[in-house]
Amino acid sequence: MDLSNLKPAEGATQAGQRLGRGEGSGRGGHSSTRGTKGQSSRSGSGTRPIWFEGGQTPLFQRVPKHGFNNAPFRTDYAIANVKRLQRLLDEEVLDEDEPVTPEVLADLGVVRTANRVKILGDGDLFDALEVKAHAFSESARQKIKQAGGSVTVVDQ
């Protein structure tokens, strides 16, 4: 005997009841074990959606709609602060002579991705740096220029 010859023991299985196949079948005819009338006696009467309120006007249709959500269209930036650039200079990870680009920041782990990097002005910068990024806050722009560095906005 092998797996291809296995079958259930005699009498171990039964065929399912066939509903709605006439009075003589014992499970058919008038209402086919569904009771009388009502939603659950109709065909296609499965579970209703969780927001279904029994025919009452649903909540999302009753409350007023107003406002606007710009989330699908907003521009998300990976951010880096000026103090982080200064710390990298202090730790001699960055070189003052090399330009700081989004790719350099991504390689150093300052930002996760080199796409859309914005430099913010938290902290202080004491060394002149050539910084290239997709956007700068006004305070970051001022601090980089005060330290003798340059700011370049790169395109996508």
Curated annotation (Swiss-Prot):
Coiled coil: none annotated. The keyword Ribonucleoprotein applies. Residues 1-56 are annotated as: Disordered. Keywords: Ribonucleoprotein, Ribosomal protein, RNA-binding, rRNA-binding. GO terms for molecular function: rRNA binding; structural constituent of ribosome. GO terms for cellular component: cytosolic large ribosomal subunit. GO terms for biological process: translation. InterPro entries: Ribosomal_uL15, Ribosomal_uL15/eL18, Ribosomal_uL15/eL18_sf, Ribosomal_uL15_bac-type, Ribosomal_uL15_CS. HAMAP family: Ribosomal_uL15. Belongs to the universal ribosomal protein uL15 family. Binds to the 23S rRNA. Part of the 50S ribosomal subunit. This is Large ribosomal subunit protein uL15. It comes from Salinibacter ruber (strain DSM 13855 / M31). The gene is rplO.
